[in-house]
Amino acid sequence: KYIVNCLDDKNTENCGICKNCIGYEEFSSVVSKDSLRKAVAFLEKVLLPIKARVQWAKTDMSGQTRIDMPNEEGICLSIYGEQGYGTMVKSGKYETKKFCDSLVEKSASVLRNLIFEKGISQLAYVPSLRSDVVKDFAIRLAAKLGIPCIDVFRKIAAKMQKEMENSSFQCSNARKSFSLRDGTSLSGSILLVDDIVDSKWTLTVCGYLLRTAGAEHVYPYALACSSKKRAD
């Protein structure tokens, strides 16, 4: 009725349902504190799987071939920028330049069973030349989990993955950006940590490098997913 009146239609009738017609709200638009608490609690329980890529993209470095040493399925804590942990990740990455203790605590809580069940003995992280925010988080998380944090990757300057036009460019960019430090030798199962997952090529390449150095299994973990397709 309100919209019809705005259009100057004189032939309007009361619907008998909306506030404009009956003079009051049939259902309250005020969100109770209890409902808000339940909504936040629900969002905090959202965990996304990081399904492993099993095939290389066709690039200037490789054909479209099978990845012979893929990652195991990993875990993503939140959806980037969304209420709850997703907001904390965004704030830590771009505002405070440090991920808060709540993210460390929650991550440790999420990962403890995986660490125990899979016998994960070390934590490796994806380095960045722009910031040490992931390194700092990884060190604190490893301490909370009671496993060593290892610094095994070398990173060279490159474009950001989100600036790449398609999967082939993202794959090529990641493969050219990362390498292992000289003499790196690994064994057992490793937790691979990054802050944000999108195309999964960074985690795929870094996980593959860990496998080539002797790691038996690599389990990715990311604080947030920024992909419209989510982490799967």
Language-model-detected regions and their locations in the chain:
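C-terminal accessory/connector segments of nucleic-acid motor ATPases
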Residues: 1-51
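Active-site-facing substrate-recognition patch
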Residues: 33-122, 135, 139, 153-189, ...
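Hydrophobic Val/Ile/Leu positions in short beta-strands of Rossmann-like dinucleotide-binding domains
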Residues: 125, 192-193
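Glycine-rich phosphate-binding loops at beta-strand->alpha-helix junctions
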Residues: 125-134
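Active-site signature of alpha/beta-hydrolase-fold catalytic machinery across serine-
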Residues: 136, 140, 205-209
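Residues at the starts of beta-strands that form the adenosine-phosphate
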Residues: 148-149, 189, 216-219
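A short, conserved beta-to-alpha structural element at the edge of catalytic cores
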Residues: 163, 207-232
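Acidic, divalent-metal-coordinating active-site segment for phosphoryl/phosphodiester hydrolysis
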Residues: 194-206
